[in-house]
Amino acid sequence: MSLISTLARLEAVRTGRAQPTATVRHRHLSERPLVLVPLTTAGEAGAPLGALVGTDRDAPRLLVVPQPRDRDLRFAFLAELADVVLPYIDTFADDVEAAERNETDPETGKRVKVEVELCADAPQLIVPSRPGIELVRLLGRSMRFRRTAEQDPETPHPAPPHVPLLGRWLTHFGERARVPGSALLLALTEVLGRHWATGQSSLEDQHLGALLAWIDPPDGVPGAEAALDAELRRDAQGQLVCPPAGPATDPAFDNKLLAPAIERYDRARTALAAAEDGLEADDRLGELTAAEREIRALVESRTRPTWDAVWHGLDLLRALPEGAHAVDRWTRDRWSFTGHRDRITAGEPPQPRRDDAVTAANKLATREREQARLDAQEALDDPLVMAGRRLAGEAFAGEVTDVVMSYSEGKSPRPRPLVTVRTDDRPHLGERVKVFRSLGGKPQSAEFVGHEEDGALVVLRVVDKMGRGKEPDVGSVPEKGDRICFTLFEHEQRGGAKLPDQEDTPWTHGGPPGEEIAVQESADPVTEEDVL
């Protein structure tokens, strides 16, 4: 935790209200995000109980599994979910624009520019908290290898159409959520926690109701009191007024309301199956419908408060102006979405359960590179974030007190002006350490030369971005009296070493993938618990 974050938390405790840790919004928010509030069944890993899903805050679609242990009902739930999610994704897949991309020419081996399609926008999925992201990944894995009756007429318990496709998309969203700065799949508690500091622990910030109580408490109520009320207050039935954001449910809800309702549903279904004539079957069907309606009402009572809280949180975030580099990161999300769309269109198989060595190394390198890029861009976009880097000795700001023109040695001398900056910061500078400042959106480098006046003055030598002439371009060198900020971290991240092709994977990393990798993986084996 940075010093700025620590101070903000202390100030939140003192004032009774969450304090901002950012002056701009560092994540892109779509104009029409798809919000998903899922619930799972206690004791059944990954077994969905229900969900509220949709793009209209006033008209969410309620999906319910009245008996979560029934495979057919689970598949029906997933089919309904696919009917909502896939059309939403398709609205972005067809709207494209022309773009250029560097690719390797197979004949010459050189990098050349080619014109390709890029989706003009991309879908965005919002879940209440981090466990919601993990559930999306779990659902994606459980669905993408399923076989439909059309794909394999002999498969037992075939999946409904589009369920495997939904699994592939959810897997892509889940994988993209692991890339720092990506906004295709967002957990609202994490985004809110990035922009505000509360007076409670990071673990307590995972409770969406408590987090919002600190950020936007009722008039006259301290944040700590409002958060405690959100966590503990119960109604006359002993149920939480602000239920957990899911996907796990409150044990009191499971034991007192949900379990008896599911038992009544099971009894009604058994009675319907045992009905001996049409009149009795009509009566039993009415009982089954009433039991299912009761479960739907229970699920909606647990998901609707969270649904409203998610949209309230989005309103708070939209009040912040978007950071300058958030658009660039969203463009990379658009490229990712376009690439996955193209892979599906080309008929490629689902993502494997386990990545090969080269793919895994590439993913790890990408995440490390994107984390460094995100840290740098947030500081460049936000003076409050930059203040934290300055306190950590990773940047410094001050006033230019002197500029002395100097030149490099050699046949073609180049300008290397010496710039003296007066600063109250204490950056961790060493001999010939490079520092960077933003000049017209591009990083300009300088070398540390030395300190003067016990560190109050920092002398730098500017080394690039001054043009090709013997004299620096106008505006490329700081002038006396300018306020400037230099960082010790690079603004742009360089790509790592090129990894070998998959067929050239060294034996130290398992060797080239075998033929078995090319065979499409099958779904998990069917167990007795899958079907009632």
Where are these regions (language model features)?
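Metal-dependent DNA phosphodiester-chemistry modules and their immediately adjacent helices/loops
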Residues: 115-124, 128-256, 263
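Structural motif
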Residues: 37-42, 67, 127-130, 423-424, ...
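C-terminal effector modules of nucleic-acid-centric enzymes and ribosome-associated factors
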Residues: 123, 436-440, 444-532
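Mixed-charge, glycine-rich, non-catalytic linkers/tails in nucleic-acid processing enzymes
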Residues: 193-341
